Amino acid sequence: MSQLLVAVSSPWASDKLAEPIADFAKRLDASVFVAHVATLQETDEHESDATQRGEQTLQLFTDRLKAAGVEAEGIMLFSDDTAKAILNTARARNCSLIVLGLTGKGVLKRLIAGDVPTNIIRSSEIPVLLCPANWDGTI
């Protein structure tokens, strides 16, 4: 059985990506690891908020995949390097594909926060599927 790693950063992902990812996973007869990375650089006050939001996002996404009949597991990661955490997890779990939902960040935000998809693509030997923010979910 193939394994997919779907990296999510917000509840938007569960609304937008869960159904098409479930369809895709079924076509591939794949299980899905849903990963969220909480950064360690956040202040204590925001870190707990970020962790709670991440756990909620994971729960929403995995519940929707399971409801669609897909084997799914949520993984909460803590790292100051989001791309590296996603890649290391995909490698450790022997994933055959990494799926990323693009947020539609502008150039300035990517320069400040870093461009996780670009860093993953440059460093990954595992294929990466990018889902644009304005994607309608059609596969």
Where do the model's predicted regions map?
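Small/aliphatic-rich secondary-structure junction motif
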Residues: 2-51, 64, 68-70
